[in-house]
UniProtKB/Swiss-Prot annotation:
It comes from the Archaea. The keyword ATP-binding applies. Residues 9-45 form the ATP-grasp domain. This is Acetate--CoA ligase [ADP-forming] II. In the N-terminal section; belongs to the acetate CoA ligase beta subunit family. In the C-terminal section; belongs to the acetate CoA ligase alpha subunit family. Homodimer. InterPro entries: Acyl-CoA_Synth/Transferase, Acyl-CoA_synthetase_A/B, ATP-grasp, ATP_grasp_subdomain_1, CoA-bd, NAD(P)-bd_dom_sf, Succ_CoA_lig_flav_dom, Succinyl-CoA_synth-like. Pfam families: ATP-grasp_5, CoA_binding_2, Succ_CoA_lig. Activity requires divalent metal cations. It is an enzyme of class 6 (ligase). GO terms for molecular function: acetate-CoA ligase (ADP-forming) activity; ATP binding; metal ion binding. The keyword Lipid metabolism does not apply. ATP binds at residues 35-46.
Length: 673
């Protein structure tokens, strides 16, 4: 229900939010009396529950100065269709205009918005968002994030009370929760040097979206002792063959039972006509049969007493209503018998600890490591593993989960499992959509491990017919971006960046600060690195005298030691090994340096492809990244050598700095929380 403005302001005042109080008038005489009581000049506004935006219908009249003018304006406002009365309030001294709002998001629930008013919010979309409830840090960050923050800080002798704005945002927690508010526009709010006043308020109360969820233990789904492959095949290349082959190739530690009524053996494993014919207990089923048969197969799985299933088959809801009906039937059986399901339409699960893999795409033996992946695509247990193993030799995985259509197991459940998994140090997520966003946020915001997220579909806003400014400005991607900031998730925008950043977290320690030393073999690279550091939120470290003295020992007299270090003259005079080793050790020892980026030219002819003393680098407890440039074959060999010894390698200095910037920002927020 839409509250009238005087009702909205009375509600806000109840929670200590200062407003320009208004008097609701239904007659001309009431309006005249109210104006005299308030004192001229006054503001007069049309009031009506079916009038969405007063200004759109000419329903706001400022600077009304006399009794006669009150009478004329009252008649004009009451002639507006759906008018129920007129609100009269004092004409406020103009301050810095801001907008504060709340809207309901389908995935995440109540979202708070802040921005500067006027052109800043309407045209420039200079706004920030956070999920409710807000912490003080959330509110402070919301205010600082907008480009117009400089106006509040102080500009041309005009200054706003930032503390009052933060306090107003924090009061939203209680008022929204207690009063069941689904939409709120406080627009404008005038911010003065001391205090802030809500000049106009629009509030809708109703039933807020609730998010009920539980987080069961998924361990049995990753550690089965026996698995039935239903739809196993003797034909190389068919999904049913590839699944069995992958299980054997990756050394699955449990028992494998191929199910095929027309085969005796597949890859030397005995076949069974159905899962019910297997004499032993079966923990998991991998189902690779046509979608229309899957409900029947699930019924047999339920009869067998399995704990979980991975449905790799496609042809479900992604193909239309008929497929959606198959999903409903499958889920009904699963719920009734307590079976958890990954998929359908997925490559499923990988656990490198026990060799459990459900992919229907032939896979290489996947390296064990500390990266966990949650993906709404089959790519990760498909072609992506070929790309990773050939281009990123350092990357190893603990668990990979392809979510598919997500009819049962959801992202937040897998995320919770990986956060508790001892083999997983960093989590990478690829998502296209999210069902229970609030559950995902709740789990993610409690994480003590870095979470790197690549979400596609950024331009598909999926807006409903928005009835408030806040709802219309609050696009899905804006909200998701706010979720990432609020939960300290590292957001990336491509698969390449996903691997670059997870690799950094996987291989190197977190920086203790934002001061970076950059070493490059060209002056141009030094300039590019400096610019990139600024935009990535990093500071170029100031070297101590001791550091400068050490580096000067391998520096020609005519060359200055600065940060970034242009190392090429040193290489020419003293050789690559001595120049790089001296410079790297010096900056790593410097207490004023938190991280190091070293760039080398890999060229066999001039032997500039420096390879460091790996053991000595680890003792400093600081991250060091390399970028390697040059001839492709030499770069590949040199990159492999570095990464297999725990040093991440990037294509150029800008790439390396951007990754370090994201890692540093994560580390800084983690320390502050």
């Amino acid at each position: 229900m839409l509250l009238l403005e005087h009702e909205s302001k009375a509600l806000l005042e109840k929670y200590g939010i200062k407003t320009a109080k208004c008097i609701f008038c239904e007659t001309e005489e009431q309006a005249v009396k109210a104006a005299k009581e308030i004192g001229f000049p006054v503001v007069m506004k049309v009031a009506g529950r079916e009038i969405v935006h007063k200004s759109d219908v000419g329903g706001v009249i400022l600077n009304v100065k006399s009794e006669d003018e009150v009478r004329e304006v009252f008649q004009r406002l009451m002639s507006i269709p759906k008018a129920e009365g007129v609100n009269i309030q004092p004409q406020l001294e103009k301050g810095i205009e801001v907008i504060v709002g709340v809207a309901e998001n389908e995935q995440f629930g109540s979202v708070a918005m802040f921005g500067l008013g006027g052109v800043f919010v309407e045209v420039l979309k200079d706004v920030s968002f956070r999920l409710l409830p807000l912490t003080r840090r959330d509110a402070e960050e919301m205010v600082r994030e907008v480009k117009g923050y400089k106006l509040l800080e102080g500009y041309r002798r005009v200054k706003g009370d930032v503390g009052a704005v933060v306090d107003l945002l924090l009061k939203l927690n209680e008022v929204v929760e207690r009063e069941s508010i689904v939409e709120m526009d406080l627009n404008p709010v005038f911010v003065y040097e001391r205090g802030a006043v809500v000049a106009d308020a629009r509030i809708v109360v109703g039933e807020r979206k609730r998010f009920d969820y539980t987080i069961p233990d998924l361990r049995d789904l990753f550690y089965p002792k026996s698995v039935a492959v239903i739809g196993a095949s003797r034909t190389v290349g068919k999904p049913g063959f590839n699944i069995v082959w992958n299980l054997k190739q990756n050394g699955f530690m449990g028992k494998i039972y191929p199910v095929n009524p027309n085969a005796d053996k597949i890859l030397e494993l005995k076949c069974y006509p159905s899962i019910l014919d297997i004499p032993d207990e079966v923990d998991m089923a991998i189902i690779a049969v046509p979608a229309k048969i899957v409900p029947e197969v699930m019924a047999e799985c339920a009869q067998k007493g399995i704990k979980g299933a991975v449905i790799v088959s496609s042809g479900f809801s992604e193909e239309g209503e008929k497929g959606a009906e198959y999903e409903r039937r499958v889920l009904e059986i699963a719920k009734k018998h307590g079976i958890r399901i990954f998929g359908p339409n997925t490559t499923g699960v990988l656990n490198t600890e026990n060799g459990f893999i459900t992919s229907f795409a032939i896979q290489p033996v996947i390296k064990k490591g500390n990266i966990g992946i949650i993906a709404q695509t089959g790519l990760f247990l498909g072609i992506m593993m070929d790309i990773v193993t050939s281009n990123h030799p350092s990357i190893g995985f603990s668990k990979i989960v392809g979510m598919g259509n997500k009819i049962d197991v959801e992202d937040y459940e897998v995320l919770d499992f990986l956060l508790k998994d001892e083999q997983t140090k960093v989590i990478g997520i690829y998502m296209e959509g999210i069902k229970n966003g609030r559950a995902f946020y709740d789990v993610a915001s409690s994480a003590e491990k870095p979470i790197v997220v690549f979400k596609s579909g950024r331009t598909e806003y999926g807006q409903k017919a928005a009835m408030s400014h806040t709802a219309s400005i609050c696009g899905d991607d804006d909200v998701f971006d706010a979720v990432c900031r609020q939960a300290n998730l590292v957001r990336v925008y491509s698969f390449d960046e996903l691997f670059d950043v997870t690799k950094a977290f996987s291989l190197q320690p977190l920086p203790k600060g934002d001061r970076v030393a950059i070493i490059h073999y060209t002056g141009s690279g030094c300039v590019q690195g400096s610019d990139a550091a600024y935009f990535a939120g990093l500071k170029l470290a100031e070297f101590s005298k001791d550091t400068v003295d050490k580096i000067s020992e391998v520096t020609p007299e005519w060359h200055n030691v600065n940060n970034p270090i242009d190392i090429w003259p040193m290489v020419e005079y003293y050789g690559a090994f001595k120049a790089y080793q001296t410079a790297i050790e010096a900056v790593m020892e410097d207490e004023g340096v938190d991280s190091v980026i070293a760039c080398v030219w890999a060229n066999r002819l001039i032997n500039a492809d420096f390879e460091p003393d790996y053991k000595s680098l680890k003792k400093y407890g600081k991250p060091i990244y390399f970028c390697v440039e040059g001839a492709r074959d030499v770069v590949f060999d040199h990159k492999n050598a570095l990464e297999l010894n725990g040093i991440p390698v990037y294509t150029n200095v800008i790439n390396a700095v951007n990754v370090l910037g994201k890692v540093t920002k994560y580390a800084k927020r983690r320390i502050q929380s």
